[in-house]
């Protein structure tokens, strides 16, 4: 009885090691970050102030432009807002949801979460009415947009993941700009 119990335990432990070993084993030579391809840019203007907020805020994004790498252009159409959350002083979680109308009349619904973390220069630049840029007011500013549409022309957008990198935030002038990149998937 003791021998069969020992054998069963040994088989079980060996199986678990084999299974978990295959699940967690990684090949460092092939463990590469995904590649990115420039997709376009996104600019919001007429950003409404999130007045008197202590943590959560809603900032209306009154107008803006989505410019695709192929030259197609879309404009913000309501609704469009950032339902943000101030985590710490000058550290924001972004929760943006917007509708864009393309020149051909197609509608794109863009939504994303992200992080915007300012550096030590941010307050001084804001007091002087100067814009924030990476390494000059912004320490980290990234988001992960998804797009939904019923347009046949833009249907491919339903199946891609974008990464947005903040380029400039000029809150005194009321605009921000992102560069957008498409994540390129590699077949395994």
Task: Place the predicted regions along the sequence by residue.
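Bacterial Sec-dependent signal peptides at the C-terminal "C-region" and cleavage site
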Residues: 18-28
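Bacterial N-terminal signal peptides that target proteins for export
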Residues: 1-11
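Bacterial N-terminal signal peptides
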Residues: 10-19
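Beta-strand-enriched cores of mature, soluble protein domains
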Residues: 26-188
